[in-house]
């Protein structure tokens, strides 16, 4: 994803893997809640392949092209089902989203992807600018010097954050949790 993998792999004890989902045939979540019974999504596809990798990982970088000021629909289907069907604690796994556009829609897409992290107690790695890079055709993003610098800073910041959290867990443990309270707006 925009040259981030080598940057993460160069960092001490960090290993990154790219998984491309945009070209896959993936259906959206139907909120059937069978994942609670099965321990995995009822639709047996790439989502169930990603779930154990996600559980083991210290962080997750999600990258998407921008389509109509939103992320790739297949990616959103994968993320929705991945986050919904995995019931392990995601607290303090570091998340980062990266978007690529010809011109506009980056901020809206960036926000859309970050919501998966924030609802899951996952801190978000930041950079010196929003994590976006520009280019339409393959290879054009390589010409975006500011975007490439933003990606390098993001890789370093995310690696630092994951290492800091690992040290913090060792020394202090995870933050205290509360039983989740649910508010229903229908009275």
Residue ranges and their predicted role:
Residues 28-31, 53, 81, 150:
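Residue-level recognition of specific faces of alpha-helices
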Residues 42-129:
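Helix-loop-strand module that forms the ligand-binding subsite of alpha/beta enzymes
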Residues 2, 26, 44-48, 72, ...:
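Electropositive phosphate-/nucleotide-binding environments in soluble metabolic enzymes
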Residues 20-41, 137-140:
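N-terminal beta-loop-helix "entrance" segment that forms/cooperates
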């Amino acid at each position: 994803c925009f040259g981030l993998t080598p940057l993460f792999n160069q960092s001490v004890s960090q290993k990154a893997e790219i998984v491309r989902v945009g070209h896959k045939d993936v259906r959206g979540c139907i909120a059937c809640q069978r994942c609670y019974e099965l321990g995995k999504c009822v639709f047996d596809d790439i989502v169930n392949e990603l779930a154990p990798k996600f559980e083991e990982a210290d962080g997750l970088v999600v990258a998407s092209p921008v389509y109509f000021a939103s992320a790739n629909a297949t990616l959103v289907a994968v993320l929705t089902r991945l986050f919904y069907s995995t019931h392990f604690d995601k607290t303090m796994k570091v998340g980062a989203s990266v978007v690529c556009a010809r011109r506009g829609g980056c901020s809206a897409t960036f926000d859309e992807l970050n919501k998966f992290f924030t609802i899951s107690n996952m801190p978000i790695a930041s950079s010196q600018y929003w994590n976006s890079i520009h280019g339409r055709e393959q290879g054009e993003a390589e010409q975006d010097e500011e975007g490439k610098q933003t990606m390098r800073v993001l890789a370093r910041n995310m690696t630092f954050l994951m290492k800091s959290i690992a040290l913090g867990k060792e020394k202090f443990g995870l933050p205290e949790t509360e039983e989740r309270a649910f508010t229903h707006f229908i009275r």
